Amino acid sequence: MPTLWKQIVFSFASILSIGSVVLLVVALSTERWVTGTTLCQTGVDLVNASRPELEQFTGHIYYGLFQGGKTRRCGLGIRRAKIYIFPKLIKKINSGLHMIIIFFLFTAIGFAVVSLAFCIYNARKVPYQSIKGPFGLYIWNFIAGKSIAMGFACFLAAIQCHKLTEHVANYSESLFTLVILEENLGFSFWLVVASAVTHGANILVVASSKIHLPKIQTKKPEEPTATGEDFLY
């Protein structure tokens, strides 16, 4: 059986691994990777709108890796539309890069689960192979963290280099052209970043299992010694 300190350390590492999986699943299933403001350029050009009137032609957009939504204002009131990345929109964007992002994140989930399994194993037993001990946990957490970092780096590249938001906003728009006024990374993206940080913290936690705490020694109570006077008494 591992020592009490190691049981505590690996139990906490298990919690971090669970947290990483939860963060990634929530990030993948939500639609706030990017939020932004759009301008209906076609409507502005048609009426030659001045700056005070531009508010009547501004809308909003939000999307994730699988779906999202937008509101469009082109002088005809607010129009809401749902955005689905699959199966059609994926053909209009850099589909290879998009699939790589999803692949990296699912890979990270897989290695986070492996890390969880080995944390539980180390909390209950003393491993007889180094790959099953802290060394293996370093590897699984490093691969998971690296995969996450590659995933959000590719997503940033899709936004900055391939104008992902502009393609998503103008998909299925035949009469109007939408211009991106502002785009921000939403909370779903930052959940992915937090998941990567979790794996870094997990490596530090696992490393702390090597710390040897001093054993608390309890003094045995001294036994009373019988003297000759005690016997006479």
Curated annotation (Swiss-Prot):
Keyword terms of this UniProt record: Cell membrane, Cell projection, Hearing, Membrane, Transmembrane, Transmembrane helix
Entry GO CC: cell hair; stereocilium membrane
UniProt record, GO biological process: auditory receptor cell stereocilium organization; sensory perception of sound
Keyword check for Cell membrane: yes
InterPro entries: Clarin
Family: Belongs to the clarin family.
Function: Plays a key role to hearing function. Required for normal organization and maintenance of the stereocilia bundle.
Protein name: Clarin-2
Gene name per UniProt: clrn2
